[in-house]
Amino acid sequence: MAERNLDFDKVINRKNTRCLKYDFAVKRGKPADVLPLWVADMDFETSSYIEDALVERAKEGIFGYSEVQTPYFEILANWMKLHHNWEIQEDWLIKTPGVVFALAMAVKAYTQPGDSVLIQLPVYYPFSEVIQDNGRKVVSSNLYQGEDNRYHIDFQDFEKKIVEENVKLFFLCNPHNPVGRVWSAEELEKIGDICVKNGVTVVSDEIHQDFVFKGKHQVFASLKKEFQDISITCTSPSKTFNLASMMISNIFIPNPELRRKFRKELDAAGTSQLGVLGLVATEAAYSKGEEWYQAMHAYVEANINYTKEYVEKYLPGVKMTDLEGTYLVWLDFRETGLTVEELEDLILNKARLWLDSGKIFGKAGEGFQRINVACPRATLTEALERIRKACYCSLRSQ
């Protein structure tokens, strides 16, 4: 049976499908008619092999408690070896309902109330939320933009913050959302050496690991045995195959003591088995979804290149940060001269777009907008045209 869902130009009406991306604009304070390109949720049909596997399981008609069987791990291990050159062991694996849930469990497992947790702003905003919501202190070693139009790590500041704030836990984002960096082995080794030296546990969010367009994704835990011993690696099929509603993530913790502490917090939270449909979807994705994945990856890369060309040609004063990984483009509007409030008004009310405002990723994100380009080209073109027209009208009125 051949893969059927390879038409990524196909525009699908997702309204009235209980879709967070499309159905909850008004509830979230947005105009009803906005075009949404905000949350990291692709507008593509997933692999037909996943669809078929879910339908076949649903036909069984019984949805009792479930657990994984050996093929699940073998399929997962094959994917990690093939795509990320990482050989995992079955006892490392812990399944959770999502990566953000795993971040919260890690905060509880490896820190005490009042402890400092390090992040690198601008970064995926739930990082800050799960730290603060669990009574810990957020400490940031901010990334900085270089002349090469990429973000970089200030390693001196990174270690200084760890020492001065007595940091216990570090949230690494690789690839980094929203700035699109894929950290090199050299950069990761510098981070890891500092964390090992100072007794810092590393939670590495690698959920976007299958979206790399420049460079090579390196699993942090795979680089050195010392890094493996201090790391919690968070992965999921939810981004790669657009399965967020399946509520399943695969967390790898090689260190037995770190694993024991993590499991203890899972037990305290009352989590046990995950839903059978998530398990079925994951097995189908990683065992039969390769053709779909490769085609989707190529389509998204073409959209990224198209966006770059469009911005350079039609949006003076706007810059697209060099994107190495993720399908989330980081647009810099600071040279337009618009204030944060004016930019928000331009995007939301004039362009009628629902993007992710840079300010939600921290103060370092002010003046930026994050746009999801994992959508049909027609949708992306419409969004970019709306920005162009809104910017033109804004300049004429000044």
Annotate the PLM regions.
Residues 89-90, 322-327, 366:
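Short Gly/Ser/Thr- and Asp/Glu-enriched loop/turn motifs at secondary-structure junctions
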Residues 52, 225-301, 309, 391-393:
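Conserved core segment of the aminotransferase class I/II
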Residues 283, 299-308, 320-333:
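Conserved glycine-rich beta-strand-loop-beta hairpin in the small C-terminal domain of fold type I
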Residues 337-339, 346-355, 361-397:
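PLP-dependent enzyme catalytic core of the Aspartate aminotransferase-like
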